[in-house]
Every structure is written in C-alpha cells, then in structure tokens.
Amino acid sequence: MTEAPQILLRHHLKQLRLPTFQGEYAKQAQLCAAENKDHIHYLARLCEMELIERERRMIERRIKAAKFPSTKSLDSFDFKIMPSLNKPLTMDLARCDYVDRRENIIALGPSGTGKTHIALGLGLAACQRGLKVRFTTAAALVHDLIEAQDERKLQRLQKQLTSQNLVIIDELGFVPLSKSGAELLFEVISQCYERGSIIITSNLPFDEWTKVFGSERLTGALLDRLTHHVHILEMNGESYRLKHSRKNRQ
C-alpha cells in the first residue's frame, strides 16, 4: 500500500474510533496472507480484536468509576477459612443475575470476617459484566450526602447513585449516624430500591441496626425495603484476616 492511502485509511479509522483496527490491520494482513485466509477472515479477525479490546477498556472504565479501595476477586477468597459463608450461593451471585432482578445482598458478621472482600469481589464481577457499580462506606456516603445537601447538590448526587446498577455500602454499623445523616441514607436507599441492587455489609445483626439509625421507625422501614428481595450472607466466626495471616505463616 502506498503512503497516501495508508494515511487516508488511518485518518478514517481514527474518525471511526477503531484504534485496535488501526494498530493491527497491517500485521493481520501479513498473517492472513501467510495463512492463505481470504478478506472475509481478515476483516472478521480485525473486528473481533476491536470488540475484545473495546470490552476490555469498558471494563477498565467501570472498575475505575466504581471507586473500589482495592481490587479483589472472589477467586482470591479462601472459603475454607470461613465455613459459615455459603460458597455456592456466593459464586452464583457472582453471575449477577440478582442485579437483573434488582435484588439486594446483605453480608453480616463480626469485624475482620471478609465481608469487604466479598463485597469487592461481587462488585468486580458486576463490572466485568459491564454493569455500573459504585462502592462507598456508610460513613463516607453520609458525609458526601450531607456535604452535597449543604452545597445544594444533593439531587445531583442522588441521581448519580440511582443511575448505578449496583451500589455497595460497606461498614454499616461501624459509626453511629446523626439524625440527619440517617435520614439522608434512608432516602438514598429508598431511591435505589427496585431501581438497582444494593450490597450492604454490617458487623451488626438486624436487631441492632437501631443503634446506627437511632430510630425504630426508620430502621424498620429501611429493613422492610432491603429485605424484600434479599440474599443474606452469614459470615460468623474467627477473623478471616487473622486466619489467613496464620495460614500464610505456616
């Protein structure tokens, strides 16, 4: 191919936003010629490579937008250390069918039992399926909601949260909430209810959630929404982190 058509082709591919196509067309032409493949195979191969790369970039963007504190997969979780956790259910949830049904997940257990790891793993699985995910702690979310309310940007933040396929709220119960903070959190969970799915991790059993929200009425209404369509992951026992550290030293 002479220089002028090459320049024109690269220009067109750039305009069409086909970077993989642009980077691979010359190499794949040589390979297809060596393999005696026709132009249909050549174009099909380039299109497949473009789609694979496009999906990879999309997943990368989803993971970045989720704001995970760290990237952890379910494959790296040692279920043998936490026998109380239902592994078949957890792995089935990683298929993300529950998101299509707008169901919720609540992981309950003492501090250090791996709840955040499981939430991160489920969040990563959702990103890998092209779903929009947002991760936050309960304390950080309440802080953001109060700040947004003070700056008259509350509706914008609520809209961002309700547009997600999955919202993950970690560490509910670690910090008591103010009355206004509890009401704002209740409001955003109510808005997300049946629009998308919610994952909540908590170190407190349900009957102690009143300590967090400070109101039996608010707690009851919140649990009514969250547990309407819910999968409960029980994670009881000795600290997962302690067991995992001990196992690694052996």
Give the label of every model feature segment.
Residues 1-21:
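Charged, compositionally biased N-terminal leader segments and the immediate start
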Residues 8-11, 27-31, 76, 104, ...:
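Short hinge/gating elements
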Residues 19-70:
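Interdomain "pre-motor" coupling segment immediately N-terminal to P-loop NTPase/helicase cores
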Residues 54-109:
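Extended interfacial segments that mediate partner engagement and assembly in macromolecular machines
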Residues 85-163, 210-213:
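Conserved P-loop
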Residues 166:
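Walker B motif beta-strand of ABC-family P-loop ATPases
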